[in-house]
């Protein structure tokens, strides 16, 4: 089937599921599939099979793959492990080559980056941080991660930012909880992620009674506010976009903005945290559109 628009394979690789899609150059989804994240062999195998079945009718128009994946990832193109998930705590997935199965099966360009860097790109192209030079995308859900864009390009250094593993100041009413990160205990991920919330209180925020909920929300917002002030001090972002389920509970965004402003104490010239700290403009599609942005990058390399 000849298509006037280019077609891209897009993979949003998460810790619980891989979302797969064929998307055309107008950002229209032509085919979508969900594959549980089990073992690499099973998950990547089923992902390849989906595209093998979905692609033939678009074969003349297909351009490239973009993979926005959980990490950590090796993003050094000079390394033989470029495109590998490295020392993840997720069982079965350490030292997994994510790129090669798609390259070998389809023989086309493939670009990979972290899920949060992908979402940061998507929000910068089409969403809440469009028009900014410096922006951050943060997800606070099962885990905690962030991606930074400077002049529209993700920061890569030794690897990529691991924002969830910075160590925050402890809330005075939260000193007894050791945190849940297997590497650092009380890092941002270990204290403020959805996993940490459930381990600390035995339930999600939206399952709590009002009094318990308000106290828990203020504690989590305290950590996110300190995180924001650190970001503002280090890289001066014009926009901090917060995704993930934790941010969608009642009053969380308002509490994070308020506590950020209180901690910043009017120090940062021109910093209006009501405008800087926002939810994704692309909503729940930021991750998949991140994979699409990476597919566009793969085509143009």
Curated annotation (Swiss-Prot):
InterPro entries tied to this protein: ATPase_NBD, Carb_Metab_Reg_Kinase/Isom, ROK, ROK_cs
Binding site for Zn(2+): 165, 181, 184, 187
Activity regulation comment: Inhibition by zinc ions.
Top class in the EC scheme: transferase
Keywords from the UniProt entry: ATP-binding, Carbohydrate metabolism, Kinase, Magnesium, Metal-binding, Nucleotide-binding, Transferase, Zinc
Keyword Secreted: no
One Pfam family this sequence matches: ROK
Residues spanning the membrane: none
EC number: 2.7.1.4
Protein name: Fructokinase
Protein species of origin: Zymomonas mobilis subsp. mobilis (strain ATCC 31821 / ZM4 / CP4)
Lineage of the organism: Bacteria, Pseudomonadati, Pseudomonadota, Alphaproteobacteria, Sphingomonadales
Gene name for this UniProt entry: frk
């Amino acid at each position: 089937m000849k298509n006037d628009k280019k077609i891209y394979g897009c993979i949003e690789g998460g810790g619980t599921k891989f979302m797969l899609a064929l998307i055309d150059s107008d950002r229209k989804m032509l085919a979508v599939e969900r594959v549980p994240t089990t073992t690499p062999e099973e998950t990547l195998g089923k992902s390849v099979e989906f595209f093998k079945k979905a692609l033939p009718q678009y074969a003349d128009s297909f351009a490239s793959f973009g993979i926005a994946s959980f990490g950590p990832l090796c993003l050094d193109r000079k390394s033989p492990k470029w495109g590998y998930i490295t020392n993840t705590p997720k069982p079965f997935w350490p030292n997994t080559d994510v790129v090669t199965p798609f390259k070998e099966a389809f023989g086309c360009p493939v670009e990979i980056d972290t899920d949060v860097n992908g979402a940061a790109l998507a929000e910068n192209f089409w969403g809440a941080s469009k028009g900014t030079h410096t922006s951050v995308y943060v997800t606070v859900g099962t885990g905690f991660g962030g991606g930074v864009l400077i002049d529209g390009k993700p920061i890569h250094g030794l690897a990529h930012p691991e924002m969830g593993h910075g160590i925050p100041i402890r809330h005075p009413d939260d000193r007894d909880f050791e945190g849940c990160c297997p590497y650092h205990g009380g890092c941002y991920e270990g204290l403020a992620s959805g996993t940490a919330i459930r381990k600390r209180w035995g339930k999600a925020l939206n399952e709590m009674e009002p009094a318990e909920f308000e106290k828990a929300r203020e504690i989590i917002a305290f950590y996110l506010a300190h995180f924001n002030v650190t970001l503002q001090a280090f890289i001066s972002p014009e926009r901090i976009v917060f995704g993930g389920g934790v941010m969608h509970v009642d009053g969380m965004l308002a509490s994070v903005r308020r506590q950020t402003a209180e901690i910043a104490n009017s120090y940062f010239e021109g910093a209006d945290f009501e405008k800087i700290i926002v939810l994704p403009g692309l909503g729940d599609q930021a991750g998949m559109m991140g994979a699409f942005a990476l597919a566009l990058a793969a085509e143009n390399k």
